[in-house]
């Protein structure tokens, strides 16, 4: 018996369907939030973050396939690393991990995984910028990385916190000084970086004509790059969106309209949103923010999210003819998972939901220009 629920949402001017009859994917063995992943052929790789030092694979073309654990990642447990696939191999960069003193620190190392023999190799290179909050995607023979926190500033904050020991007053003083700054004073990465595995070289692909971001949704499809929102300083997101295009003269950028606000709500931008393409339509969903933070920032409060609660979201947006609109909602709030475009669907793998609870679920969303389907 086919169990489908269809709702015509007049406020959204879209039909969306929850389908229990389409292909379903197995849950992850463990909840993975703040991790990373990539697609190689028909196989998706997901790991790290709350998954520890583990990576798992799933053959998407096999309806009966289950997740399989691959060789343990040799770089140790870490959150918010960047990953991408080039020439059939998986590359993992950076992240945030504890050192021997117990300090959370940005790391800028790089590793390669070869599926043919299930082995990892540490690469003789280091990223030229901090890679926490960075977003990565591959194009041709390169990995492109956008945004990220400043290594020295971020590491210094955690070093100072550990040095404060049990002195809560000192910790409060450190936090107040850290959050009470303008966005530009955090020195988020404002260059588009690339890494070319064949030459083991990093390249500055040009300065982005917008503020540095952390946790932005970043997607490359063909020669087009799309950047949606992200943090512009700790606790403060932006609703701005941008589009780039690879040309003979480098990446040419233009601004897109801001992401619209859901009905009856403010739009405080999103960090940790998930994105991809379905039937040629760009989709972005989920993410988290602090409702009211943009208002407080405009009122002159640099610690923009002070006193506010973090919120996770479920709206699904699409970009059509240069305009954004909301076409439906997920059955749950989600953020900081891994998303990948596959077979005209966008897979939403893991992530976290309200309160930061790690998810094991694998959802698929698709959109044909009229109807959003959620599996």
UniProtKB/Swiss-Prot annotation:
Quaternary structure annotation from Swiss-Prot or TrEMBL: Homodimer.
Similarity remark: Belongs to the NanM family.
Primary location recorded for the protein, binned into one broad class: periplasm
Record InterPro entries: Kelch-typ_b-propeller, NANM, NanM_proteobact
UniProt-annotated catalytic positions: 231 (proton acceptor)
A Pfam entry, by short name: NANM
Organism: Haemophilus influenzae (strain PittEE)
The keyword Isomerase is assigned to this record: yes
Chain's role: Converts alpha-N-acetylneuranimic acid (Neu5Ac) to the beta-anomer, accelerating the equilibrium between the alpha- and beta-anomers. Probably facilitates sialidase-negative bacteria to compete successfully for limited amounts of extracellular Neu5Ac, which is likely taken up in the beta-anomer. In addition, the rapid removal of sialic acid from solution might be advantageous to the bacterium to damp down host responses.
PANTHER family: LD33804P
Name of the protein in question: N-acetylneuraminate epimerase
SUPFAM superfamilies: Kelch motif
Catalytic activity entry: N-acetyl-alpha-neuraminate = N-acetyl-beta-neuraminate
HAMAP family: NanM (MF_01195)
């Amino acid at each position: 018996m086919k169990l489908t629920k269809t709702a015509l949402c007049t406020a959204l001017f879209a039909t969306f369907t929850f389908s229990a009859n389409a292909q379903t994917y197995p849950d992850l063995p463990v909840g993975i939030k703040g991790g990373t992943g990539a697609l190689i052929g028909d196989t998706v790789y997901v790991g790290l973050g709350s998954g520890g030092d583990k990576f798992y694979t799933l053959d998407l073309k096999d309806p009966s396939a289950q997740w399989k654990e691959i060789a343990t990642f040799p770089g140790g447990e870490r959150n918010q690393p960047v990953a991408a696939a080039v020439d059939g191999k998986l590359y993992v960069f950076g992240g945030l991990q504890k050192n021997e003193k117990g300090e959370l620190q940005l790391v800028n190392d790089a590793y390669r995984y070869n599926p043919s023999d299930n082995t990892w190799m540490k690469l003789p290179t280091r990223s030229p910028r901090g890679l926490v909050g960075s977003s990565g995607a591959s194009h041709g023979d390169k990995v492109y990385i956008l945004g990220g926190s400043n290594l020295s500033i971020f590491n210094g904050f955690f070093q100072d916190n550990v040095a404060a020991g049990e002195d809560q007053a000192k910790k409060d003083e450190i936090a107040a000084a850290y959050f009470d700054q303008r966005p530009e004073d955090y020195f988020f990465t404002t260059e588009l970086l690339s890494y070319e595995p064949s030459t083991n070289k990093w390249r500055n692909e040009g300065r982005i004509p917008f503020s540095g971001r952390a946790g932005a949704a970043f997607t490359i499809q063909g020669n087009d790059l799309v950047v949606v929102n992200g943090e512009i300083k700790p606790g403060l997101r932006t609703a701005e969106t941008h589009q780039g295009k690879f040309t003979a003269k480098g990446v040419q950028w233009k601004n897109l309209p801001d992401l619209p606000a859901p009905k009856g709500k403010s739009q405080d931008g999103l960090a940790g949103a998930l994105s991809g393409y379905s039937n040629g339509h760009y989709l972005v969903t989920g993410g988290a923010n602090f409702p009211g933070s943009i208002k407080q920032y405009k009122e002159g409060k640099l610690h923009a999210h002070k006193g506010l609660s973090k919120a996770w979201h479920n709206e699904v947006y699409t970009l059509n003819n240069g305009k954004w609109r909301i076409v439906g909602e997920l059955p749950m709030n989600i953020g900081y998972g891994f998303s990948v475009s596959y077979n005209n669907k966008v897979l939403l793998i893991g992530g976290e939901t309200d309160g930061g609870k790690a998810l094991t679920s694998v959802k698929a969303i698709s959109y044909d220009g009229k109807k959003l389907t959620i599996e």
